[in-house]
Amino acid sequence: MGILNLTPDSFSDGGKWNNFETAIHRAMEIEEQGAHFLDIGAQSTRPGYVAVSEEEEWNRLKCVLKVIKNKVKIPVSVDTFYPEIARRAMEYGVDIINDITGCENSKMFEIACKYNCGIVINHNFGNLEIKSFFEKKLLESIQYGLRPQQICFDPGIGFNKTRNQDAHILKHLKEIKISQNALLVGASRKRIIGACCGNPPPQERMPGTIAAHTIAVLNGANIVRVHDVKEAVQALKVTNFINNTD
């Protein structure tokens, strides 16, 4: 899953893709480089972020979404915690809702059910009670009419967690994963990578990101969310080839 941030203040690439032309170019490039999904966000969720309004988030998204859906063939997700933004994005043909709050607002389930779209549910707490959270959210989503195949879980690397907690999660993904649901991991350029490597700037954390995501895939992750698509695709092709060879 390739990341496209339309924000001026994201922790690693803020301001890089936040005008119309560069955003469209990057979306097409992400697909060309081999991503299976495109995740578009217009709200920075870096540590200590201040949320922008629903109106501001939609102003950043609306023109780009409409064009991108006509330019790329891979499924597109919208990274938002506002139900109304998710609903509007569905009207533009977006395929997946990616909610970092873990669908704290149950309207997200109603929207996903109405539009028959995918939904990513993120664990956003500073504890390791992740599987029980996933099980609770799975039951809740089914009660709203969603099918298990629509639901993807994210253990929330870097969301209110310590470096050791993040490492524990990556090491124990097989124990966290629910077999009937896809598992997404997003460690790209995050604090755990920096903390292990002398805290280089986020843009210099690609090798560490690849190491973390390789471990994640070997431990059961189905999707990894990345900034550096070309390099991640190559690394995971090699990982999967070796892992699947007798």
Give the predicted meaning of each segment.
Residues 38, 75-78:
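Flavin-dependent oxidoreductase catalytic cores
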Residues 25-41, 219-220:
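Catalytic domains of carbohydrate-active enzymes, especially glycoside hydrolases
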Residues 40-43, 154-157:
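Glycine-rich beta-strand-to-loop/alpha-helix junction loops that act as flexible
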Residues 4, 30, 34, 79, ...:
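Conserved, mostly hydrophobic/aromatic
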Residues 11-21, 25-26, 45-63, 67, ...:
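Active-site-adjacent loop and "lid" segments of alpha/beta metabolic enzymes
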